[in-house]
Swiss-Prot record:
This is Putative arsenical pump-driving ATPase. PANTHER family: ARSENICAL PUMP-DRIVING ATPASE ARSENITE-TRANSLOCATING ATPASE, ATPASE GET3. CDD domains: ArsA. It comes from Prosthecochloris vibrioformis. Belongs to the arsA ATPase family.
Length: 405
């Protein structure tokens, strides 16, 4: 299943672009589902139809859905929430506050992600279009699998090797202790979520099937936010294959007020084409009316894609590469707008940590690099090059053997 994720600053028109893309995919014979994770629920407005928590048929080959995160939360997290609510209330926390405390930050978005796996596994759809929340929320959403993976592994091991073996003996010793032991269904729910989260990460970073498309306006704040988004998306291994600049004024516009805005847009458009190169940049005009309903979306879709299939890979270069040159093995990350001063790199075990500002990426290293310290990272031609010297690995191995002797 081809997965296209659209994101951008609030108000740039990403819902219209997402809906139009889905319409075009369906016209080309792809069984398409467009799914909105934006709590604003603009997708209903775009199609001019009331959408629910399950797929609604729009036309042939096209279904749409607006996720209700609280419904998914209750379905997937109820047993865990029930247990922690009981524990918090035993400590004197009020019922409503106890319920709220059981929901971890990002948990609502997490269950929106789990739907991706569900719809992929059904085999009912050839394409999934994700209409996401504004950029900041989307980055938080897409980085959840990486951000939580280390903690989840730790919790899972605690459950497996400590909680489960000791729960029955301890519960027999004291009723009070038994009260705090999580029930089996709560432990199983946590395990299931952890396993599915790892699967979601694999699906979204499958650079053959999944790509992200950035929607922006030719305005300074929109451009800056999109630049940051591109850097962090590449950091987490998501392939971006297209940039769409929306709401551009007609080049023939010559009225005083709009003429000034047109000049501003043209100035920023040049910066966008230069800065985001070699990504393809699609320019989309400002319409003289709202883009609402299937007919309007069909027109908009033709302006975006023409005769091109939206499922095509518009730019095909992976955001992470492993390159070997002699005894030097390089991990290369595409970080087009990163500030080298903000980059920190270190290795723990078989994991390479790359941190930019408050965003962190964990990359599992090949076995051949395990135990090696990275050399000095170099930022060159929009790529971060992190070298590992394989010759030093041999030296480390010989030293260990000597110490054993």
């Amino acid at each position: 299943m081809r997965i296209l994720t659209f994101t951008g600053k609030g108000g740039v028109g990403k819902t219209s672009v997402s809906a139009a893309t889905a319409v075009r995919l369906s016209e080309m014979g792809h069984r398409t589902l467009v799914l909105s994770t934006d709590p604003a629920h603009s997708l209903s407005d775009s199609f001019n139809l009331q959408l629910g928590a399950e797929p609604t048929k729009i036309k042939e080959n096209l279904h749409a859905i607006e996720v209700n995160p609280y419904v998914d939360l209750k379905e997937n997290w109820h047993s865990v929430q029930k247990y922690y609510t009981r524990v918090f209330m035993a400590q004197g926390v009020s019922g409503v506050m106890a319920d709220e405390m059981t929901i971890l930050p990002g948990m609502e978005e997490l269950f929106s992600l789990l739907r991706i796996k569900r719809y992929k596994s059904t085999g009912l759809y050839d394409a999934l279009v994700l209409d996401t929340a504004p950029t900041g929320e989307t980055l938080r959403l897409l980085s959840l699998p990486d951000t939580l993976s280390w903690g989840m592994k730790a919790v899972k091991n605690v459950n497996k090797y400590i909680v489960r073996p000791l729960s029955k003996p301890l519960s027999k010793m004291s009723d009070k202790i038994a009260y705090y032991i999580p029930p089996e269904d709560a432990i199983e729910s946590v395990d299931q979520v952890f396993d599915e989260l790892e699967d979601i990460r694999d699906i979204l970073t499958d650079n053959v099937k999944s790509t992200v498309r950035l929607v922006m306006n030719a305005e300074k704040m929109s451009i800056k936010e999109t630049m940051r988004a591109l850097t962090y998306l590449n950091l987490y291994g998501f392939k971006v294959d297209m940039v769409l600049v929306n709401k551009l004024l007609d080049a023939q516009e010559n009225s005083g007020y709009l003429e000034k805005w047109k000049g501003i847009q043209q100035k920023y458009l040049g910066e966008i084409e230069e800065g985001f190169s070699p990504l393809p940049v699609k320019k989309l005009k400002m319409y003289d009316q709202e883009i609402v309903g299937v007919k309007s979306l069909e027109v908009f879709a033709h302006d975006i894609y023409g005769d091109t299939d939206p499922s095509d890979m518009m730019y095909d270069e992976p955001p992470i590469k492993f390159v070997r040159k002699g005894d030097i093995y390089e991990v290369q990350l595409k970080l087009m707008f990163a500030n080298p001063v903000d980059i920190d790199v270190w290795v723990t075990g078989d994991e390479l940590f790359v941190q930019i500002g408050n965003q962190r990426k964990i990359i599992t290293l090949p076995v051949s690099l395990t135990g090696l310290e990275p050399g000095d990272a170099v930022f060159r031609d929009k790529w971060l090059h992190i070298p590992f010297d394989l010759e030093k690995q041999g030296q480390h191995h010989r030293t260990r053997e000597f110490n054993k002797a």
